[in-house]
Amino acid sequence: MVKETKLYDLLGVSPSANEQELKKGYRKAALKYHPDKPTGDTEKFKEISEAFEILNDPQKREIYDQYGLEAARSGGPSFGPGGPGGAGGAGGFPGGAGGFSGGHAFSNEDAFNIFSQFFGGSSPFGGADDSGFSFSSYPSGGGAGMGGMPGGMGGMHGGMGGMPGGFRSASSSPTYPEEETVQVNLPVSLEDLFVGKKKSFKIGRKGPHGASEKTQIDIQLKPGWKAGTKITYKNQGDYNPQTGRRKTLQFVIQEKSHPNFKRDGDDLIYTLPLSFKESLLGFSKTIQTIDGRTLPLSRVQPVQPSQTSTYPGQGMPTPKNPSQRGNLIVKYKVDYPISLNDAQKRAIDENF
């Protein structure tokens, strides 16, 4: 029997929900109330994100189920010297029931970071920038405690009711500025951006005692992501002993140069070399598309200077709808002769 069901209600799931049901509930609720949507509600979105952050952590979920939201926020209940009830029992006497130690106040930025990591850094709906969400425009949260008053519950020195020995007020945590964001360029091939490949690699970072350590980072690329797309991982960089937190890592997609294709938005450009003869009499060739298929190209008429041919649906996937693709644009590069002999000149003169 859980103490309260508020967080489960925010995600639209039952207290017995498993991990997949929690993720499904968060996805539906977060998309509905995201501030960029017409149905958006910033405060509701923050509550939904905090609910998922707590319930998706087995330890925090256990604390929430047993003691409630404030306990989950602060990491668990604390008791006086006499334990629960203490030597003098509960209810305003020495050694009575303890309160909760203070924890990090869940902020708007925390909400957007959770959303970004859940969806891999890209926008899951139209109207947002292809490079993902920018969190710098959203203010950080952080209230003084329940009721907005210093000292937490009741806002009075003695806790609830202001009586010594009763419930102690929530202790306030020191407020630190947001951890530094370290950007790391991530070179990716067009083929990997086409299919949306998973990239896994190990990074070195400083641990709590200054020693070097390694951790694995997994990035699930989304089909059609472009250069400049940012994927943010909070609390994954070097450890900061002053705050007890880690720096934020932000990976920036960089497109590797391709031997055959040049990208222009969702379109791919292929330059096809032609001899002077082929440019006049026509040609029949094949090229390999970005997804490995063979595409036949042919013409029976002369190729005009700066002429191109467009093949719809043969380019890169569009990030907002990967089932749709841009175009393949073929440009022709004619190898014009540097010089002509007399016979060639006569042939041109007699026929043109």
UniProtKB/Swiss-Prot annotation:
Transmembrane parts of this sequence: none
GO biological process, one term: tRNA import into nucleus
Pfam families given in the database record: DnaJ, DnaJ_C
Modified residues (Phosphoserine): 275
SMART domains: DnaJ (SM00271)
Recorded GO MF terms: DNA binding; misfolded protein binding; protein-folding chaperone binding; unfolded protein binding
Any GO CC annotation of this UniProt entry: cytosolic small ribosomal subunit
UniProt keywords, alphabetically: Cell cycle, Chaperone, Cytoplasm, DNA-binding, Nucleus, Phosphoprotein
Comp. bias (Polar residues): 301-312
Residues covered by region (Disordered): 300-325
Location (main, coarse): cytoplasm
Domain J: 4-70
Superkingdom of origin: Eukaryota
Compartments where found: Cytoplasm; Nucleus
InterPro entries, sorted: DnaJ_C, DnaJ_domain, DnaJ_domain_CS, DnaJ_subfamily_B, HSP40/DnaJ_pept-bd, J_dom_sf
Role, per record: Required for nuclear migration during mitosis. It is required for the normal initiation of translation. Might mediate the dissociation of a specific protein complex of the translation machinery. Essential for viability.
Assembly behavior: Interacts with polyadenylate-binding protein PAB1.
Additional facts recorded: Present with 20300 molecules/cell in log phase SD medium.
Name of protein: Protein SIS1
Gene symbol of the encoding locus: SIS1
